[in-house]
Amino acid sequence: MGDTMVEPVPVKLSDQSLVLRGNGGSALCVITEGVGEASLVIDPDVAQKACQEVLEKVKMIHGSSVESLDKVDGGDAGDGGSLANGDTEPKLTNTGHTSTSSRINEEESPLDINSVKNARRRQKNNSAKQSWLLRLFECKLFDVSMAISYLYNSKEPGVQAYIGNRLFCFRYEDVDFYLPQLLNMYIHMDEDVGDAIKPYVVHRCRQSINFSLQCAWLLGAYSSDMHISTQRHSRGTKLRKLILSDELKPAHKKREIPPLSLAPDTGLSPSKRTHQRSKSDATVSISLSSNLKRTSSNPKVENDDEPVRLAPEREFIKSLMGIGKRLATLPTKEQKTQRLISELSLLNHKLPARVWLPTAGFDHHVVRVPHTQAVVLNSKDKAPYLIYVEVLECENFETSLVPVRIPENRIRSTRSVENLPECGITHEQRASSFTTVPNYDNDDEAWSVDDIGELQVELPELHTNSCDNISQFSVDSITSQESKDPVFIAAGDIRRRLSEQLAHTPTTFRRDPEDPSAVALKEPWEEKVRRIREGSPYGHFPNWRLLSVIVKCGDDLRQELLASQVLKQLQSIWESERVPLWIRPYKILVISGDSGMIEPVVNAVSIHQVKKQSQLSLLHYFLQEHGSCTTEAFLTAQRNFVQSCAAYCLVCYLLQVKDRHNGNILLDAEGHIIHIDFGFILSSSPRNLGFETSAFKLTAEFVDVMGGLNGDMFNYYKMLMLQGLIAARKHMDKVVQVVEIMQQGSQLPCFHGSSTIRNLKERFHMNMTEEQLQILVEQMVDGSMRSITTKLYDGFQYLTNGIM
């Protein structure tokens, strides 16, 4: 922690053992000096701490003489009284006299009475210490980070059990951030920690099907480092089997199945109801030996047998991973792309279904994958691919009806509900726009929904009074809502901004067979959404959304997940400290020890793609995209570049991120840079070559975008780095504990060596003054700019992989 941080309650981790073992000293209420002429009331804990410090100093000075003196005093302890803190009073001086207080105690307090009093005092002191720790746990500043720290560091079962119960009081999203840490502690730490964590995990699994699957995937991934014989009988494996057995279903009443001829009651007239079809999409019958079987649509079966909740989603994810494995066997990228489109086209025959994209943050059902938009990403040995997924947002994933399949060749008859979310559509009207699946008993995939030849989609009536003139501008848009005073805008400013926007529209990339992802990633996200929606049979639904995801097979994403957690923690720290640094953490989903999913960064392409497509330097590309160096657009993009560059330089330094070639650094449409691919952090480096020895990557091209070494923006960059490092070290414990807990039982390359955590702590430079930190930042910036190893590694990547 930094010098300015003050803990609200000064309780150390070492106090826990004192609290729960009951070994605290007796309460010290009064200290008597001399013959009782003066007395001073002192806080008992302060006095005890002071006595302990004095005793330690005496032992350091006198060594063994103190120990011998203690033995002598201990032998005579029965002859005299004792102080309230348990230490014996001085007996006989050199002249043979005893103190007045000693004589009083000998006369008035027998030994047995003193023992009882001391026991009572120790009990009171123990209760006081317990209340101290309880006050810490119940104070408003006690957050999830502190709870995880106590759970990891405490050796007392009582504290661990209390923290396990305390987890129920925190928000779900706060605890979910530490889910990898909780599950790793459950797998690799002692039983007391596991017993404290398990009730919360089981409770959440009963509440959420998405949480259940994430736990199962993480438990499998973090158990993979164990020996195979140990892994079979580990707690993590047992809990994973419990989750996947679907025994943790919520204990609620089964859903009622509507009659076959009626739709859910949405207030429609009887004549309209007769056109609705009912659907039973809940029951899943699965035969693992013959892949997937079609959903049973018999209502009688559904009422008798509860569905397997997790099977459809698991099979959906398994299908996506299988595509990636098959693509990796093909030699050329063109063949991989053709195979990917064919595989996804077949996948669409199983959709819509009660499946979802785990990287999304809202409930939805997957209805379609536009297969022609999918692309294979750059990778030498593997075949990661990017897909776009059409979903329909719903209120509850498990209880909402799955929309019916609409054939691809069906022509939509209307576009009038393209922008319905803002037009006053009620929940009942939105629900009535869905039809349901007919009762077919065909044999097909477990997570698919039956195809329908003919479909009648009923659209809700529009409230025209709330949507009239939706594209017209109101005069109120340029006036304050409280005050109707007009805001005057100079005509010259309007003309200048319009001319800048027209003259410097973003460029497009040409199609490259060796890099098909460049064109797809360069297209603005808003245009892509509009284009795909227009060509989708589901695009007319008001709750239609477009998501994207990168599917990776053959890569261990556990290090990526760890780096993502550190980035989120640093982002939160800099926001709380009001340091204007910019980073873009992206979601990582670990499926197993060698597969997972990644949230793509939209509106961003790699610097390698920029240089290859434009054949320009980074500065000239900025000028081409944002206008001349005096325009508002360029200055904004330059500031964004500086703020993001400073942030990622600190991230790369603290985590020792390697493999920083231009294919792993993105540039978005607003000028930010985003680092991706954190496969080499902390103690690991590519092939252990040791090319990259600088603190971070800072090339001459980066400095040129900042305006040169003597520019104001370059000085601003160094100032941001200093402010960011000062803010980060104030909260060092929050960052370090995320990494330290994941080292337990891990065989990841980033944890090789015994000094990983110690070196991480040293990079926060807790012993330096701010002036010394400023000198350090200057040295790191200068060393990174002049680093010959950075140039060597870029050259190595160009020769071996063609990365510019």
Curated annotation (Swiss-Prot):
**Region described as Catalytic loop: spans on this chain:** 656-664
Localization, UniProt = Endomembrane system; Mitochondrion outer membrane; Rough endoplasmic reticulum membrane
Topology within the bilayer: Peripheral membrane protein
Q: State the UniProt keywords alphabetically.
A: ATP-binding, Endoplasmic reticulum, Kinase, Lipid metabolism, Membrane, Mitochondrion, Mitochondrion outer membrane, Nucleotide-binding, Transferase
Disordered, as annotated region: 69-122, 251-309
In which residue ranges is the amino acid composition biased (Polar residues)? 91-103, 281-300
Q: Give residue ranges for domain PI3K/PI4K catalytic.
A: 523-789
Q: What class of enzyme is it?
A: transferase
Ranges for region G-loop: 529-535
Sequence ranges assigned to domain PIK helical in this UniProt record: 55-245
Q: Give the Gene Ontology MF terms in alphabetical order.
A: 1-phosphatidylinositol 4-kinase activity; ATP binding
Report the sequence similarity comment from the record: Belongs to the PI3/PI4-kinase family. Type III PI4K subfamily.
Please name the PANTHER family in this protein's record: PHOSPHATIDYLINOSITOL 4-KINASE BETA, PHOSPHATIDYLINOSITOL KINASE
What name does the UniProt record give this protein? Phosphatidylinositol 4-kinase beta
Protein species of origin: Xenopus laevis
What's the name of its gene?
pi4kb
